[in-house]
């Protein structure tokens, strides 16, 4: 079986990670002790992707939990599914990273990283044929961002041909913990551009807006935001966990979704949007699901796809529905909005259907878009970064851990390059793409 090793780093990463395990354990009929009480063979068909089968028929998540302080791990351990994890897979320090990327990446995190890699190695060795890794973390703090990206580069060194996938929570002033979030996020993106194959950008700004506008929650809590994240993560991984044809493993998803190696930042979306503990009173139709799914209000990144163009799209429908109707509606959506899809990648929208809906819903749809509009998110962080960096505000916290200002400048320009690359492909047309090539060759020859 093609296995995935899951890592979660830092407070945010551990909270959304453990929520993810609660949701998928429930979907696969696995209780908090790791025993199976399901009702469908489909639940066990590809259970090995995320779970090890231990003695006594218990299923144990193939998960590694990492943090630089014990607090969050203690609450995961005492949480609803805390006992399902392998006790040896909790790796934590005592010092904390104090929301400082440099501590996570260069000092405190670097001291803990080898003991994490030992656990990762052990999990990888227990795999029949490892397809890759997924990391849940945030980009705004110290551990998830600094140590998370350190782990990615170390794992990349050791497993260069395996897929590296991240669920990265992007900071926003609307839900802010720390003033240095733009620094931490920019330094992280600098790493993610080079070292991951696919990154799902989960944007706190968008989550907050969904809770506030759509779900009418006046003061959204992290619990409310995480409910949306777990629904999205469950949807995105559906094809990996249940039998199916399309995007059935991380590599196939990457091949369909990533036309250029650096442009691997996806906007996830979900429909229908429900609040925690909320009830769906009427079942949606396929046309409604499709329409909602492409609506910017349902996107988990605060970008409006109408301000850019889609390079590629993957859609996952869940529940019992007619394949024919799904295909018709998806074609319809593309034809009606053809100007929002680049014409130089034909058939750039792929659709999968899975029979098992998420709990509490008859039907649901998950959206994964690789859109040039994601540049709005990077621009937002870049502006906040520049505002502080030109005054060198708070820099001493980073240089004190041995960092050089040069690294900040490099990270800043790498992110600006990324924005220009997205813009370049947004403006490209089918005809002129060929002309660029020729001009380039001509200049080289001159």
Curated annotation (Swiss-Prot):
Tubulin is the major constituent of microtubules, a cylinder consisting of laterally associated linear protofilaments composed of alpha- and beta-tubulin heterodimers. Microtubules grow by the addition of GTP-tubulin dimers to the microtubule end, where a stabilizing cap forms. Below the cap, tubulin dimers are in GDP-bound state, owing to GTPase activity of alpha-tubulin. One of its GO terms (biological process) is microtubule-based process. It is found in: Cytoplasm, Cytoskeleton. Residues 426-446 are annotated as: Disordered. Keywords: Cytoplasm, Cytoskeleton, GTP-binding, Isopeptide bond, Magnesium, Metal-binding, Microtubule, Nucleotide-binding. A motif (MREI motif) lies at residues 1-4. Brain. This is Tubulin beta-1 chain. GO terms for cellular component: cytoplasm; microtubule. Mg(2+) binds at residue 69. The MREI motif is common among all beta-tubulin isoforms and may be critical for tubulin autoregulation. Pfam families: Tubulin, Tubulin_C. PANTHER family: TUBULIN (PTHR11588). GTP binds at residues 11, 69, 138, 142-144, 204, 226. Residues 429-446 have a biased composition (Acidic residues). InterPro entries: Beta-tubulin_BS (IPR013838), Beta_tubulin (IPR002453), Tub_FtsZ_C (IPR008280), Tubulin (IPR000217), Tubulin/FtsZ-like_C (IPR037103), Tubulin/FtsZ_2-layer-sand-dom (IPR018316), Tubulin/FtsZ_GTPase_sf (IPR036525), Tubulin_C (IPR023123). Belongs to the tubulin family. One of its GO terms (molecular function) is metal ion binding. Some glutamate residues at the C-terminus are polyglycylated, resulting in polyglycine chains on the gamma-carboxyl group. Glycylation is mainly limited to tubulin incorporated into axonemes (cilia and flagella) whereas glutamylation is prevalent in neuronal cells, centrioles, axonemes, and the mitotic spindle. Both modifications can coexist on the same protein on adjacent residues, and lowering polyglycylation levels increases polyglutamylation, and reciprocally. The precise function of polyglycylation is still unclear. The gene is tubb1. The lineage of its organism: Eukaryota, Metazoa, Chordata, Craniata, Vertebrata. Gene3D superfamilies: Helix hairpin bin, Tubulin/FtsZ, C-terminal domain, Tubulin/FtsZ, GTPase domain. Its cofactor is Mg(2+). Dimer of alpha and beta chains. A typical microtubule is a hollow water-filled tube with an outer diameter of 25 nm and an inner diameter of 15 nM. Alpha-beta heterodimers associate head-to-tail to form protofilaments running lengthwise along the microtubule wall with the beta-tubulin subunit facing the microtubule plus end conferring a structural polarity. Microtubules usually have 13 protofilaments but different protofilament numbers can be found in some organisms and specialized cells. The modification 5-glutamyl polyglutamate is found at residue 438. Its main location: cytoplasm.
């Amino acid at each position: 079986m093609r296995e995935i090793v899951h890592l979660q780093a830092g407070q945010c990463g551990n909270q959304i990670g453990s929520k993810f395990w609660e949701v998928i354990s429930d979907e696969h009929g696995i209780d908090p002790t790791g025993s199976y009480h399901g009702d469908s063979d489909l639940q066990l068909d590809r259970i090995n992707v995320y779970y090890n089968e231990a003695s006594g028929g218990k299923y144990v998540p193939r998960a590694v939990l990492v943090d630089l302080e014990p607090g969050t791990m203690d609450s995961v351990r005492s949480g609803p599914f805390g006992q399902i994890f392998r006790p040896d897979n909790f790796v934590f320090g005592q010092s904390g990273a104090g929301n400082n990327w440099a501590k996570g990446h260069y000092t405190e995190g670097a001291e803990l990283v080898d003991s994490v890699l030992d656990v990762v190695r052990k999990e990888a060795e227990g795999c029949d044929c490892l397809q890759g890794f997924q990391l849940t973390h945030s980009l705004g703090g110290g551990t998830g961002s600094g140590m998370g990206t350190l782990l990615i580069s170390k794992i990349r060194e050791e497993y260069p041909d395996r897929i590296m996938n991240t669920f990265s929570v992007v900071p926003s002033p609307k839900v802010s913990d720390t003033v240095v979030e733009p620094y931490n996020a920019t330094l992280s993106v600098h790493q993610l551009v080079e070292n991951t194959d696919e990154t799902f950008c989960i944007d706190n700004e968008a989550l907050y807006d969904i809770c506030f506008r759509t779900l009418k929650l006046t003061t959204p809590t992290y619990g409310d935001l995480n409910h949306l994240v777990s629904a999205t993560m469950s949807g995105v991984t559906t094809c990996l966990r249940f039998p199916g044809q399309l995007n059935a493993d991380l590599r196939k998803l990457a091949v369909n979704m990533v036309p250029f190696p650096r442009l691997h930042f996806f906007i996830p979306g979900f429909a229908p949007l429900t609040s925690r503990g909320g009830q769906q009173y009427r079942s949606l139709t396929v046309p409604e699901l499709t329409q909602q799914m492409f609506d910017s209000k349902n996107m988990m990144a605060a970008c409006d796809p109408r301000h850019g163009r889609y390079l590629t799209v993957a859609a996952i429908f869940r529940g019992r529905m007619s394949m024919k109707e799904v295909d018709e509606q998806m074609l319809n959506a593309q034809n009606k909005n053809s100007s929002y899809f680049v014409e130089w990648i034909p058939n750039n929208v792929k659709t999968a259907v899975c029979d098992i809906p998420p709990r509490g819903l008859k039907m649901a749809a998950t959206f994964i878009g690789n859109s040039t509009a994601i540049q709005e998110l990077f621009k937002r962080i870049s502006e906040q970064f520049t505002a502080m960096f030109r005054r060198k505000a708070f820099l001493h916290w980073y240089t004190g851990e041995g960092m050089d200002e040069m690294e900040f400048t490099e990270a800043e320009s790498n992110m600006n390059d990324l924005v220009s690359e997205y813009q370049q492909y947004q403006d490209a047309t089918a005809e002129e793409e060929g002309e660029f090539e020729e001009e380039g060759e001509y200049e080289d020859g001159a």
